[in-house]
Amino acid sequence: MSKIKLAAVCLSLACTLTIQAHASTITVTNTNDNGPGSLRQALADVNDGDTIDATQVSGTITLTSGQLLVDKSVTINGAGAEVLAIDGNATSRVFQTVTGAKTVSISGLTISNGQLSQGGGILNAEATILTIIDSTLNGNKAGLGGGVFNSGTLIIINSTFSSNMASQGGGIYNSGSGMSTISNSTFSGNAAPVAGGVSFNVGTMQIADSTLSDNSADSGGGVYNIGTLTIINSTVSGNMASGNTAGAGGGATFNVATMNVVSSTISGNIANREGAGIYNSDGGTLTITNSTFSDNAALLTGGGVYNSGTLQLANSTFSDNSAAFLAGGILNFANFEIGSTILKRGDSGENIYSNSQGIVTSLGYNLSSDDGGKILTGPGDQTDTDPLLGPLQDNGGPTFTHELLFGSPAIDAGDPGFTPPPFFDQRGPGFNRVINSRIDIGSFEMQTGGTPTPTATTTPASSATPTPTGTATATPTATSIATATVTPSTTATATATATPTATPGATATATMSPTVTPTPTASPRPTPRPRALPTPRARRTPAPRP
């Protein structure tokens, strides 16, 4: 090794040891907003790499001197979300990081009642890595991102977002430069008068092992996506798209760009117009694999999925979805590919209605309780056949599923040429995807050995479908600027008013008002798993809008 290289290595090691030697812990001793022993003073005193210890403090820190600025790489440890809260006093944001290569971790805190045009609870600046662990964001308000506005890297682990509100992105606004990863977390009761009750995503977002329930927005009651979105091993249930204008919809999600749904359950969502489960708009590419869509209800068309982009559907189960006029299961106006999927008709609307000038392909081995829109003509397709499904319930794994009852014609009737991956059915490890040498149709694999005797029940062809009084057309108002790709591995009663024209570094814009005064009603959901077989269809019988 040359003397120059040796000197460089020694200098680097010396710097590392110096940083480690100087890293220290600063202890918070009271709940004052400022002064000795306060969290604000600790943030002013820290150096990069330090830890702030607030584990011995309980109660509420009410901010009276503005937001807390985090301008160092620091770890902030609270006493627990149920023990220590930081309240923005409805006058300021709670935390803001600064632009730069900083790494910030926040754990064991409740962040509440923050308010500003962007990121009522937290604003995470570009190039900063922010990790939120074991924390709660509740009752924060903004124009963009009621809970968090993210332009950097956001990692959320085992946390709860509830009753946050914004014009766009009630829980999170993830900007074009933002990368968000959410795991083992719950989002409930968040609201967005415009779009994205849980999140408005312009960048890249992955949601894994999480629950999104009872959130609401005009479009995209759960997530409004114009970037790249992946949902894995998660439940999206009981969300609502309340918009009544043409192009509004997406009770669970509204997709304009790239979206993947893997091993997840989309259930009990409602749309006042189209796409109670997912509205896949013009230009959107939606891929659904090993997933369940159950009991979603659209008051016009497309109870499970409304598609005017590109839809790819494989090894999934659609059951008891409904629409008042057309397509309780899937409404297709564009490109549609389906394989190894179960379609069980709900109370209203056929399983598939396809009126498309695009490419419609059956890859075969599908099973429909009605005629399947007369498009299921591939090898092994079964139509007018009862799939014999159990109720939506806990059959093991992280999400609810419909089990195949003994004698189901879906058992051992999937593609005989299928070889893993995936290695497991929707429920994950412990539930092999292939039993008895051949895959089952749908998202659920019967685990018992032997070959059940098929007892398929033929049902009469569906009755004539009413002619809709209007033509459903998607009119997305934003276009995706994200290029990254991801590989899969309300009840809020407050109403935000708006003013600032906050425009993050993404194409989406929002009008909000800094005079947001209502306080949303917190609605914690201690049981995040979806309720078995909810019946949202009975909630409304509106007159259709053209």
Protein language model regions, located:
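Extracellular/surface recognition and adhesion modules
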Residues: V28, A42, I76, F95, ...
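Residue-identity detector for glycine
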Residues: G176, G247, G283, G449-G450, ...
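N-terminal, post-signal-peptide segments of secreted/periplasmic proteins
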Residues: I19-Q118, N124-E126, L130, G329, ...
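Ser/Thr-rich, Proline-interspersed low-complexity disordered segments
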Residues: T451-R545
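Predominantly extracellular beta-rich ligand-binding scaffolds that present long acidic/polar faces
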Residues: I129-L137, N150-Q168, Y173-A195, S199-D218, ...
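Sec-dependent, cleavable N-terminal signal peptides
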Residues: M1-S24
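Ser/Thr-centric signal marking residues that sit
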Residues: T25, T31, T75, T110, ...
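Leucine-biased recognition of intrinsically disordered, low-complexity hydrophobic segments
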Residues: L144, L299-L300, L533
